[in-house]
Amino acid sequence: SADVHTQKVVVKKFLIPLGLFLGLVIFLAVGLNRDPREIPSPLVGKPAPAFSLNTLDANAPKFGPQDMKGKVWMLNVWATWCVACREEHPVLVAFSKANQLPIVGLSYKEVQPQDEPAGKKFTPEEKLQFARDRSALWLKRHGNPYVLSAVDLDGRVGIDYGVYGVPETYVIDKEGVIRYKRVGVVTPELLQSTILPLVQKLSAS
């Protein structure tokens, strides 16, 4: 009858949007509950984005990933203002002493707006010098696990590397390809269970 047909149409009109809504809710719930550290980076398996940056050493030439060609190495994104980096740093210092794997630092957005004098903006040279001075002092106090640390003042290199926040760590192979990315703190357990076995495998190939 017409009434039954009308009821079916109404039910369909109601159920389809409801189904779509529930599907969206489930999708979002899964996404929100998923640890962002476990989400694979689209960069893994691809060449590390090229860059050329000043380092903390004013007398050293600029650095880029191409300078590490032929070596397996780690790139660690850090900053002195990063609270989680303080938790991670002793782990990296101990690791660098016990292993031959070169760790390159990427000093990320070291100079924050509140660091600049009131009513005055740093020139690019002043900004770089401020970053060098504060970072050098911090590394002297906490230990230096890095063979060198490049300075990403404006965070542009961080954008190319898909940096969510600090710290982040990448393992890069002899051909300059990113093989692993970690968002968040590197722990001793992670080094032993994941990073070291990967490094040994890449070094042997």
What are these regions (language model features)?
Residues 14, 140-146, 151-202:
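Thiol/disulfide oxidoreductase modules built on the thioredoxin-like
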